[in-house]
Amino acid sequence: MKKILFILTNICLISSLFLRCTPVSQTPVPAGNPADSFKVSVTNGYGTGNYKIGDTVHIWSRECASNETFDFWNGDTTLINQEWHSWFIMPAKNVAFSASFKTVSWNITYEKIKARNNLKNVYYIFPPGQIGIVYLFHGANGSASYWVNNYEPNALIKDLVANGYAVIITEAEEVTLNQDTNGDGELRWVANNLDSVNNIDFANLKAITDTFYNRKLTSRNIPRYCIGQSNGGSCSIAFATTFNLTAAAAYCAAGGAAGTAVNTTKSGIQFCLEQLDNNSTMGLSGNISAINNSQSIQNRGVCSKYFINITSPLYPERFARNTLISKALSGQIFTEIQNAGLLKSNNKFIGYASNLWNAVKSSPQKFPVTSGLSVTQQNIVTEQLNCITTAHQFFSDHDKLTMRFFNNPCY
């Protein structure tokens, strides 16, 4: 009975978080500024309009050039987190925000580096004055190139480098071999074996890191961290635990696949969750497990936090976050989606990205622009729709919170 009550309590907790963050209306009210509405003004970004008191309002910085990243908001900043995408409850006053940006000097190096048994695909960058090393772990059936070839993970790398972190990326041994060695049907990291020698993935990472130490590209004296998505999220918890890293951030992962790590870790662990995660092992039950695991870690006196990324409206310029789609083209795609009835009245997308592609396939005449996109551009649209619908995918909406956790897991 106690267990049932505990689960119900967590369901209510998550539900209350969702309801508290769900806007009554993201769509600006008609001009004329009724008595129960006030104005939001956004410079260098999106979200300007009149909103009713009590609405949850989303704002976004403008798209970044390849050599820049979002830095901070000026204005009524007590209302928001300092993220490129932030939201707040509309107060009974006019508010204004202006986005500022930071130039990033960065160039990722790729090479094949000998690990324990095989040459591994490795991407890395060691900025001057680095304050720490961050390892990035792809999800099941992913690869090292996932982090550099997709916009959202690429945005994370820029944020890390801009804030002084070195980055090391490689891939699971099963991916290198293109062989499902344990027969679980996926190409994955070994996340349930907390052994630095017998876990092939951990042995590989140690060998690669030692290579960089021996080249004098970095120092053994700076702290280390890791970030992973899905299976990579579980692996990040296990890796941090095995090598006693300062902290780890697990995206779209509950930690149950990380062996005994949740019960033994001395590393700070942050769980980064999606509100409507559509992976079979996550969803509401997975989010509850992650929250329970975070609490369990805290109960042992180790710092742990979690957050839930909530669904957000689609705005016309959204797809231009990736420069392979212009703002004009993004606006045309948005209009086709809107005209096809795929958006709610508050501009939230109905369902997941597959709804768009099913509609395009069944009625291509309604999507003359979207149906003509290249495969790369289609993938960009899918990636951004996954972000706003909080599907099972990495998202950069909380990069600042993750780096804040790394800087001080007990903040």
PLM region spans:
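C-terminal catalytic histidine-bearing segment of alpha/beta-hydrolase fold enzymes
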Residues: 299-411
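Alpha/beta-hydrolase active-site loop
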Residues: 182-216
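Surface-exposed interfaces of beta-sheet-rich extracellular modules
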Residues: 56-84
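Primarily recognizes the serine-hydrolase "nucleophile elbow" in alpha/beta-hydrolase
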Residues: 218-266
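Short beta-strand element of the alpha/beta-hydrolase
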Residues: 131-139
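Bacterial Sec-dependent N-terminal signal peptides
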Residues: 15-41, 102-103
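The feature captures the conserved acid-bearing segment of alpha/beta-hydrolase catalytic domains
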Residues: 246-337
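N-terminal cap/lid segment of alpha/beta-hydrolase-fold proteins
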Residues: 102-129
